[in-house]
Amino acid sequence: MASMWAPEHSAEAHSNLSSTTDDCGSVSVAFPITMMVTGFVGNALAMLLVSRSYRRRESKRKKSFLLCIGWLALTDLVGQLLTSPVVILVYLSQRRWEQLDPSGRLCTFFGLTMTVFGLSSLLVASAMAVERALAIRAPHWYASHMKTRATPVLLGVWLSVLAFALLPVLGVGRYSVQWPGTWCFISTGPAGNETDPAREPGSVAFASAFACLGLLALVVTFACNLATIKALVSRCRAKAAVSQSSAQWGRITTETAIQLMGIMCVLSVCWSPLLIMMLKMIFNQMSVEQCKTQMGKEKECNSFLIAVRLASLNQILDPWVYLLLRKILLRKFCQIRDHTNYASSSTSLPCPGSSALMWSDQLER
């Protein structure tokens, strides 16, 4: 998703901009710039760490997991680079979108890009959660049956989402300029006199499909992560009863459970408001486009804008919850442990070269 930190007073909402509004607009442009730079740095760091770890790994399963994380970071990074500059350009121009894009092709490209990179990120995260749950809950079945390489699966997900996002180009669904006029996305309903009644059923179906697919991906991710946490706790208790390294297993389980809960919190906070609000607007036969022509829609329009802002944060937070924070916190923990000599070498958690895959080495035993 793009960095949609739009100002509350846009050129489209107010055609007669005063100097004060211009000043506000120039200040507001700092938001999308900050979002783009922050997302670029985080995802670039994640890709660098994944690349270094990938070259050191010999296990195909671990390489597949690293490839999924790298693909997710690349997806978020490319999505930002394709959309954020357009938003910044609209901010700085202080002109209506229709003046910058009279043909509507840029709007279609923008909406398609947001759909592809937003939905593909959700589906890739869901696929990673499924693989993680199978590897932990049924390791022997997973090792003997899961022979598919990660690359074809990731390409299949991306191409499927691309085919879905191209439906509005074929006449099923519609991408339109969204309030306050600085971005384009899926139309959820009628837009006053501008809407073609013949295309409205297709728009509703397409928007509903996007929201339902996104919510389904969230549900699958939540269910698989909870199943993984439950399996980790059960295995930790079993290991503690027969092994002397119960402290090590406790640390591994706690750290992994915290990371998985962090992933669930980030996904729910970032995506649930937008997807649920889209379904609500479809049910109420409302579209954000109506904010340009109808009074009394300020509350709904502001709520939808906040929901899109939250969704845009997912691109920035993804590399941190999946990789960067785990590596940083683990190193900090090891530094504290080494400083206090808390654990002996026989039960200490391995620190050199630790990464998001550290726990998988232990769980295979």
Swiss-Prot record:
SUPFAM superfamilies: Family A G protein-coupled receptor-like. Residues 1-30, 90-108, 174-203, 284-303 are extracellular. It is a multi-pass membrane protein. The keyword Disulfide bond applies. Disruption phenotype: No visible phenotype. Mice are born at the expected Mendelian rate. Females have normal fertility. Mutant mice have normal renal function, urine volume and urine osmolality. Mutant mice fail to develop fever in response to pyrinogens, including IL1B, prostaglandin E2 and bacterial lipopolysaccharide (LPS). Mutant mice lack the normal potentiation of platelet aggregation by prostaglandin E2 and display prolonged bleeding times and decreased susceptibility to thromboembolism. GO terms for molecular function: prostaglandin E receptor activity. One of its GO terms (cellular component) is plasma membrane. It is found in: Cell membrane. Ligand binding is affected by cAMP-dependent phosphorylation in brain membranes. Its main location: membrane. Residues 56-68, 131-151, 230-259, 326-365 are cytoplasmic. Detected in platelets. Kidney, uterus, and mastocytoma cells, and in a lesser amount in brain, thymus, lung, heart, stomach and spleen. Residues 13-22 have a biased composition (Polar residues). Residues 1-22 are annotated as: Disordered. The chain crosses the membrane at residues 31-55, 69-89, 109-130, 152-173, 204-229, 260-283, 304-325. One of its GO terms (biological process) is positive regulation of miRNA transcription. Disulfide bonds join C107-C184. The keyword Cytoplasm does not apply. Glycans are attached at N16, N193. Keywords: Cell membrane, Disulfide bond, G-protein coupled receptor, Glycoprotein, Lipoprotein, Membrane, Palmitate, Phosphoprotein, Receptor, Transducer, Transmembrane, Transmembrane helix. Receptor for prostaglandin E2 (PGE2). Required for normal development of fever in response to pyrinogens, including IL1B, prostaglandin E2 and bacterial lipopolysaccharide (LPS). Required for normal potentiation of platelet aggregation by prostaglandin E2, and thus plays a role in the regulation of blood coagulation. Required for increased HCO3(-) secretion in the duodenum in response to mucosal acidification, and thereby contributes to the protection of the mucosa against acid-induced ulceration. Not required for normal kidney function, normal urine volume and osmolality. Interacts (via C-terminus) with MKLN1. Belongs to the G-protein coupled receptor 1 family. This is Prostaglandin E2 receptor EP3 subtype. It comes from Mus musculus.
